[in-house]
Amino acid sequence: MLAPDHDGRRQPSFLPPEARVGGNPAREARVCHRLVGRPMNAHDFSVKTADGDTRDLREYAGRVLLIVNVASKCGLTPQYEGLEALHRDARDRGLQVLGFPCNQFGEQEPGSDAEIQEFCSTSYDVTFPVFAKVDVNGGEADPLYAYLRAEAPGDFGPDYGFLYEHVASSRPEAIGTDEIKWNFTKFLIDPDGNVVRRYEPTVTPEQIRADLDAMLTA
């Protein structure tokens, strides 16, 4: 849910007024940590659904979450198939995949929320929730993503081959930071809402399966 600030910028309503510090979502989250007097976790955030409603991530408490920024026109878009396979195979054991479309990487998610929903349904028969389009980097980054990045900065480096070379040449300022590097970055969240691990875009859903199985059987 959003509320207007003094400068007209829309602010996440879960932040009290004194936590709204001028367009820095990560800092806002840290201020909110102190104000509420307890550690923040992923369940403390609300997100916007594709039809404009608000969903409280606390609804997923007790489930293992895999949070992914997705895109419809990316070379990694076929990962939807693997994500859906994970979701179908493990949802009855407590897994919930959550997709967040983003157009910040090569403008590879240009469609409306309705068009994205149609694409996911017709192209990959996606049954896990795909939310409204968000920014994941920059001053307008969704507060959930500011939190995820701060909790798991990632290990992105030369070992990621062609993707590293692409990011290093096109967005060199992102190297060595907690920024999301490309579409299909994945965050694993435990049933208590804590960030366990970040997987860079080229790590496939199938490569994550062992980690999911271990957490779901713990």
Predicted feature locations:
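Non-catalytic, surface beta->alpha helical segment in thiol-disulfide oxidoreductase systems
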Residues: 197-217
